[in-house]
Amino acid sequence: MSADFRHEPVLANEILELLRPRPGELFLDGTLGGGGHSGLLLEAGARVIALDKDPRALAAATARLARFGEAFRAVRSDFRDAKNVLEALGIAAVDGALVDLGVSSPQLDEAERGFSFSRPGPLDMRMGDTGETLEDLLRRIDERELARILREYGEEPFARPVARAVKAALETEAPLDTARLAEVVAGAIPRKAWPHRIHPATRTFQALRIAVNDELGALAAWLDGLPGVLAPGGRAAAISFHSLEDRMVKEKFRALTQACTCPPDLPVCACGAKASFAAITRKAVKASDEEIARNPRARSARLRAVEKLR
Protein backbone atom coordinates (compact mmCIF):
# COMPACT_ATOMS: atom_id res chain seq x y z
CA MET A 1 0.00 0.00 0.00
CA SER A 2 1.14 3.52 -0.68
CA ALA A 3 2.36 5.27 2.44
CA ASP A 4 0.24 8.24 1.44
CA PHE A 5 -2.85 6.84 3.11
CA ARG A 6 -1.23 5.64 6.30
CA HIS A 7 -2.42 7.79 9.16
CA GLU A 8 -2.44 7.67 12.92
CA PRO A 9 -6.01 7.32 14.18
CA VAL A 10 -7.07 10.22 16.38
CA LEU A 11 -8.05 9.41 19.98
CA ALA A 12 -7.20 5.73 19.46
CA ASN A 13 -7.08 4.71 23.13
CA GLU A 14 -10.23 6.65 23.91
CA ILE A 15 -12.12 4.96 21.05
CA LEU A 16 -11.17 1.51 22.30
CA GLU A 17 -12.14 2.43 25.85
CA LEU A 18 -15.54 3.81 24.84
CA LEU A 19 -16.57 1.32 22.14
CA ARG A 20 -15.15 -1.72 23.99
CA PRO A 21 -14.84 -4.00 20.94
CA ARG A 22 -14.92 -7.71 21.71
CA PRO A 23 -14.01 -10.69 19.51
CA GLY A 24 -16.72 -11.47 16.99
CA GLU A 25 -18.66 -8.24 17.42
CA LEU A 26 -19.60 -6.31 14.28
CA PHE A 27 -18.71 -2.63 13.88
CA LEU A 28 -19.52 -0.06 11.23
CA ASP A 29 -16.75 2.44 10.45
CA GLY A 30 -18.50 5.16 8.45
CA THR A 31 -15.30 6.98 7.50
CA LEU A 32 -12.60 4.46 6.60
CA GLY A 33 -9.95 6.95 5.43
CA GLY A 34 -6.53 5.42 6.00
CA GLY A 35 -8.03 2.55 7.96
CA GLY A 36 -6.61 3.55 11.32
CA HIS A 37 -9.75 3.17 13.40
CA SER A 38 -10.89 0.07 11.53
CA GLY A 39 -7.49 -1.43 12.23
CA LEU A 40 -7.89 -0.79 15.95
CA LEU A 41 -11.23 -2.60 16.02
CA LEU A 42 -9.92 -5.50 13.95
CA GLU A 43 -6.87 -5.88 16.19
CA ALA A 44 -9.29 -6.28 19.10
CA GLY A 45 -10.91 -9.22 17.31
CA ALA A 46 -14.01 -7.42 16.05
CA ARG A 47 -15.39 -7.59 12.52
CA VAL A 48 -15.68 -4.34 10.56
CA ILE A 49 -17.73 -3.02 7.67
CA ALA A 50 -16.15 0.24 6.54
CA LEU A 51 -17.47 2.95 4.23
CA ASP A 52 -15.73 5.69 2.27
CA LYS A 53 -16.51 7.78 -0.81
CA ASP A 54 -12.88 8.10 -1.83
CA PRO A 55 -11.84 5.20 -4.11
CA ARG A 56 -8.15 5.82 -3.44
CA ALA A 57 -8.66 5.63 0.31
CA LEU A 58 -10.72 2.46 -0.10
CA ALA A 59 -8.04 0.77 -2.21
CA ALA A 60 -5.21 1.76 0.12
CA ALA A 61 -6.98 0.79 3.34
CA THR A 62 -8.25 -2.47 1.86
CA ALA A 63 -4.69 -3.44 0.97
CA ARG A 64 -3.47 -2.48 4.43
CA LEU A 65 -6.17 -4.46 6.21
CA ALA A 66 -6.20 -7.47 3.88
CA ARG A 67 -4.48 -9.58 6.57
CA PHE A 68 -7.73 -9.61 8.54
CA GLY A 69 -9.44 -11.57 5.77
CA GLU A 70 -13.22 -11.89 5.94
CA ALA A 71 -13.37 -9.95 9.20
CA PHE A 72 -13.01 -6.75 7.16
CA ARG A 73 -15.22 -5.53 4.34
CA ALA A 74 -14.96 -2.14 2.61
CA VAL A 75 -17.84 -0.55 0.71
CA ARG A 76 -17.72 2.55 -1.45
CA SER A 77 -20.48 4.68 0.03
CA ASP A 78 -21.24 7.87 1.92
CA PHE A 79 -21.76 7.24 5.63
CA ARG A 80 -25.13 8.96 5.37
CA ASP A 81 -26.30 5.76 3.63
CA ALA A 82 -25.08 3.43 6.38
CA LYS A 83 -28.49 1.89 7.04
CA ASN A 84 -29.08 1.20 3.35
CA VAL A 85 -25.64 -0.41 3.02
CA LEU A 86 -26.31 -2.71 5.97
CA GLU A 87 -29.72 -3.67 4.59
CA ALA A 88 -28.17 -4.47 1.20
CA LEU A 89 -25.68 -6.75 2.98
CA GLY A 90 -28.47 -8.46 4.90
CA ILE A 91 -27.32 -7.08 8.25
CA ALA A 92 -30.03 -6.03 10.71
CA ALA A 93 -27.84 -4.18 13.22
CA VAL A 94 -24.26 -3.69 14.40
CA ASP A 95 -22.63 -3.71 17.83
CA GLY A 96 -20.90 -0.37 17.32
CA ALA A 97 -20.66 2.54 14.91
CA LEU A 98 -18.00 5.18 14.43
CA VAL A 99 -17.41 8.27 12.31
CA ASP A 100 -14.27 10.39 12.20
CA LEU A 101 -15.35 13.64 10.56
CA GLY A 102 -11.89 15.00 9.87
CA VAL A 103 -10.36 15.25 6.42
CA SER A 104 -7.54 12.73 6.10
CA SER A 105 -3.97 13.97 5.86
CA PRO A 106 -3.50 12.69 2.28
CA GLN A 107 -6.57 14.59 1.13
CA LEU A 108 -5.30 17.76 2.78
CA ASP A 109 -1.75 17.34 1.55
CA GLU A 110 -2.41 16.41 -2.08
CA ALA A 111 -2.68 19.66 -4.02
CA GLU A 112 -4.70 18.03 -6.79
CA ARG A 113 -7.55 17.30 -4.37
CA GLY A 114 -8.19 21.02 -3.95
CA PHE A 115 -8.29 21.11 -0.13
CA SER A 116 -4.96 22.84 0.46
CA PHE A 117 -4.26 26.56 0.23
CA SER A 118 -0.51 26.12 0.66
CA ARG A 119 0.00 24.77 -2.86
CA PRO A 120 -1.88 25.49 -6.11
CA GLY A 121 -4.50 22.93 -7.03
CA PRO A 122 -7.83 22.75 -8.88
CA LEU A 123 -11.02 24.06 -7.29
CA ASP A 124 -12.31 20.58 -6.48
CA MET A 125 -12.68 19.72 -2.74
CA ARG A 126 -14.77 16.59 -3.35
CA MET A 127 -14.21 13.75 -0.90
CA GLY A 128 -14.95 11.31 -3.73
CA ASP A 129 -14.70 11.60 -7.48
CA THR A 130 -18.33 12.29 -8.34
CA GLY A 131 -20.64 15.25 -7.88
CA GLU A 132 -20.23 18.99 -8.04
CA THR A 133 -16.73 20.46 -7.71
CA LEU A 134 -15.93 23.64 -5.83
CA GLU A 135 -15.64 25.54 -9.10
CA ASP A 136 -19.05 24.24 -10.17
CA LEU A 137 -20.51 25.42 -6.86
CA LEU A 138 -18.89 28.85 -6.99
CA ARG A 139 -20.15 29.46 -10.52
CA ARG A 140 -23.66 28.22 -9.75
CA ILE A 141 -24.42 30.26 -6.63
CA ASP A 142 -24.62 34.03 -6.33
CA GLU A 143 -22.66 36.28 -4.00
CA ARG A 144 -25.41 36.35 -1.40
CA GLU A 145 -25.59 32.56 -1.16
CA LEU A 146 -21.81 32.32 -0.99
CA ALA A 147 -21.76 34.77 1.90
CA ARG A 148 -24.37 32.68 3.70
CA ILE A 149 -22.25 29.54 3.28
CA LEU A 150 -19.15 31.29 4.61
CA ARG A 151 -21.04 32.73 7.57
CA GLU A 152 -22.94 29.56 8.55
CA TYR A 153 -20.40 26.85 7.76
CA GLY A 154 -17.18 28.74 8.40
CA GLU A 155 -18.35 31.26 10.98
CA GLU A 156 -16.43 33.81 8.92
CA PRO A 157 -17.08 37.35 10.29
CA PHE A 158 -16.07 38.91 6.96
CA ALA A 159 -18.31 36.66 4.87
CA ARG A 160 -19.72 39.42 2.66
CA PRO A 161 -16.44 41.03 1.55
CA VAL A 162 -14.86 37.61 1.09
CA ALA A 163 -17.78 36.43 -1.04
CA ARG A 164 -17.60 39.60 -3.12
CA ALA A 165 -13.87 39.19 -3.70
CA VAL A 166 -14.15 35.50 -4.58
CA LYS A 167 -16.93 36.05 -7.12
CA ALA A 168 -15.00 38.91 -8.70
CA ALA A 169 -11.81 36.84 -8.97
CA LEU A 170 -13.73 33.95 -10.46
CA GLU A 171 -14.93 36.22 -13.26
CA THR A 172 -11.70 38.09 -13.95
CA GLU A 173 -8.99 35.50 -13.32
CA ALA A 174 -8.75 32.25 -15.26
CA PRO A 175 -7.95 29.67 -14.22
CA LEU A 176 -8.31 30.25 -10.49
CA ASP A 177 -6.49 27.71 -8.31
CA THR A 178 -6.60 27.05 -4.57
CA ALA A 179 -3.45 29.01 -3.75
CA ARG A 180 -4.75 32.07 -5.56
CA LEU A 181 -8.19 31.61 -3.97
CA ALA A 182 -6.52 31.69 -0.55
CA GLU A 183 -4.76 34.94 -1.48
CA VAL A 184 -8.06 36.47 -2.61
CA VAL A 185 -9.74 35.48 0.65
CA ALA A 186 -6.88 36.82 2.77
CA GLY A 187 -6.93 40.08 0.84
CA ALA A 188 -10.61 40.60 1.62
CA ILE A 189 -10.02 40.35 5.38
CA PRO A 190 -8.41 43.29 7.21
CA ARG A 191 -4.91 42.27 8.22
CA LYS A 192 -5.53 43.31 11.83
CA ALA A 193 -8.40 40.78 11.90
CA TRP A 194 -6.32 37.84 10.66
CA PRO A 195 -6.39 34.87 13.08
CA HIS A 196 -3.20 34.39 15.06
CA ARG A 197 -2.75 30.63 14.71
CA ILE A 198 -4.39 29.77 11.39
CA HIS A 199 -4.28 31.00 7.81
CA PRO A 200 -6.90 33.73 7.16
CA ALA A 201 -8.47 31.51 4.48
CA THR A 202 -8.97 28.55 6.83
CA ARG A 203 -12.57 29.36 7.75
CA THR A 204 -13.53 29.98 4.13
CA PHE A 205 -11.95 26.73 2.94
CA GLN A 206 -13.72 24.84 5.72
CA ALA A 207 -17.06 26.34 4.73
CA LEU A 208 -16.58 25.58 1.05
CA ARG A 209 -15.53 21.98 1.76
CA ILE A 210 -18.61 21.47 3.93
CA ALA A 211 -20.85 22.87 1.20
CA VAL A 212 -19.29 20.88 -1.65
CA ASN A 213 -19.65 17.59 0.24
CA ASP A 214 -22.86 18.39 2.15
CA GLU A 215 -21.01 17.27 5.26
CA LEU A 216 -23.59 18.50 7.76
CA GLY A 217 -26.38 16.80 5.81
CA ALA A 218 -24.44 13.55 5.87
CA LEU A 219 -23.83 13.85 9.61
CA ALA A 220 -27.50 14.58 10.29
CA ALA A 221 -28.53 11.50 8.29
CA TRP A 222 -26.03 9.30 10.17
CA LEU A 223 -27.20 10.58 13.54
CA ASP A 224 -30.87 10.12 12.64
CA GLY A 225 -30.17 6.57 11.49
CA LEU A 226 -28.42 5.39 14.66
CA PRO A 227 -31.53 3.95 16.37
CA GLY A 228 -32.11 1.70 13.36
CA VAL A 229 -28.45 0.71 12.94
CA LEU A 230 -27.36 -0.23 16.47
CA ALA A 231 -28.32 -3.42 18.28
CA PRO A 232 -29.35 -3.11 21.95
CA GLY A 233 -26.17 -2.52 23.92
CA GLY A 234 -24.49 -1.15 20.80
CA ARG A 235 -22.32 1.94 21.09
CA ALA A 236 -21.83 4.86 18.73
CA ALA A 237 -18.97 7.37 18.70
CA ALA A 238 -18.41 10.51 16.66
CA ILE A 239 -15.17 12.47 16.35
CA SER A 240 -15.71 16.03 15.16
CA PHE A 241 -13.22 18.77 14.37
CA HIS A 242 -15.19 22.00 14.39
CA SER A 243 -17.96 23.55 16.44
CA LEU A 244 -20.77 23.04 13.91
CA GLU A 245 -20.27 19.28 13.82
CA ASP A 246 -19.72 18.98 17.55
CA ARG A 247 -22.87 20.99 18.26
CA MET A 248 -24.92 18.70 16.00
CA VAL A 249 -23.54 15.57 17.67
CA LYS A 250 -24.04 16.99 21.16
CA GLU A 251 -27.65 18.01 20.51
CA LYS A 252 -28.61 14.73 18.82
CA PHE A 253 -27.00 12.60 21.51
CA ARG A 254 -28.75 14.67 24.16
CA ALA A 255 -32.09 14.14 22.41
CA LEU A 256 -31.49 10.39 22.17
CA THR A 257 -30.73 10.13 25.88
CA GLN A 258 -33.71 12.16 27.07
CA ALA A 259 -36.69 10.21 28.34
CA CYS A 260 -39.54 12.58 29.15
CA THR A 261 -41.16 14.34 26.19
CA CYS A 262 -43.61 16.37 28.25
CA PRO A 263 -43.70 20.17 27.93
CA PRO A 264 -41.11 21.77 30.24
CA ASP A 265 -43.80 23.62 32.22
CA LEU A 266 -45.41 20.38 33.45
CA PRO A 267 -44.40 19.83 37.11
CA VAL A 268 -44.67 16.02 36.86
CA CYS A 269 -43.94 13.70 33.93
CA ALA A 270 -47.13 12.43 32.32
CA CYS A 271 -45.74 10.71 29.22
CA GLY A 272 -43.97 7.81 30.93
CA ALA A 273 -41.41 7.65 28.14
CA LYS A 274 -38.10 5.93 28.74
CA ALA A 275 -34.80 6.86 27.16
CA SER A 276 -33.59 4.49 24.45
CA PHE A 277 -29.96 5.65 24.73
CA ALA A 278 -27.55 6.46 27.55
CA ALA A 279 -24.67 8.91 27.41
CA ILE A 280 -21.21 7.37 27.71
CA THR A 281 -19.41 10.70 27.60
CA ARG A 282 -20.81 13.51 29.74
CA LYS A 283 -18.71 16.04 27.85
CA ALA A 284 -16.51 15.96 24.79
CA VAL A 285 -13.32 13.92 25.12
CA LYS A 286 -10.21 15.73 23.86
CA ALA A 287 -6.77 14.56 22.83
CA SER A 288 -4.03 14.46 25.44
CA ASP A 289 -1.07 16.82 25.32
CA GLU A 290 1.09 13.85 24.35
CA GLU A 291 -1.11 12.99 21.37
CA ILE A 292 -1.26 16.61 20.22
CA ALA A 293 2.53 16.81 20.35
CA ARG A 294 2.70 13.68 18.21
CA ASN A 295 -0.19 14.63 15.90
CA PRO A 296 -1.02 18.38 15.90
CA ARG A 297 -4.21 17.78 13.90
CA ALA A 298 -5.67 16.06 16.96
CA ARG A 299 -5.81 19.40 18.77
CA SER A 300 -9.33 20.22 17.60
CA ALA A 301 -10.74 16.67 17.84
CA ARG A 302 -13.84 16.19 20.02
CA LEU A 303 -15.21 12.73 20.81
CA ARG A 304 -18.71 11.94 22.07
CA ALA A 305 -20.36 8.53 22.53
CA VAL A 306 -23.71 6.97 23.43
CA GLU A 307 -25.04 3.45 24.08
CA LYS A 308 -28.34 2.05 22.86
CA LEU A 309 -30.33 0.62 25.76
CA ARG A 310 -33.19 -1.11 23.98
Curated annotation (Swiss-Prot):
Binding residue positions for S-adenosyl-L-methionine: G35, G36, H37, D52, F79, D100, Q107
Pfam families membership: Methyltransf_5
Molecular function GO labels: rRNA (cytosine-N4-)-methyltransferase activity
UniProt keyword annotation of Disulfide bond present: no
GO biological process per UniProt: rRNA base methylation
Enzyme Commission identifier(s): 2.1.1.199
Keyword terms of this UniProt record: Cytoplasm, Methyltransferase, rRNA processing, S-adenosyl-L-methionine, Transferase
InterPro entries (UniProt xref): RsmH, SAM-dep_MeTrfase_MraW_recog, SAM-dependent_MTases_sf
GO cellular component terms, semicolon-separated: cytoplasm
Catalytic activities: cytidine(1402) in 16S rRNA + S-adenosyl-L-methionine = N(4)-methylcytidine(1402) in 16S rRNA + S-adenosyl-L-homocysteine + H(+)
Function summary: Specifically methylates the N4 position of cytidine in position 1402 (C1402) of 16S rRNA.
Family recorded in the similarity comment: Belongs to the methyltransferase superfamily. RsmH family.
PANTHER family (UniProt xref): 12S RRNA N4-METHYLCYTIDINE METHYLTRANSFERASE, S-ADENOSYL-METHYLTRANSFERASE MRAW
Protein's recorded name: Ribosomal RNA small subunit methyltransferase H
Organism of origin: Anaeromyxobacter dehalogenans (strain 2CP-1 / ATCC BAA-258)
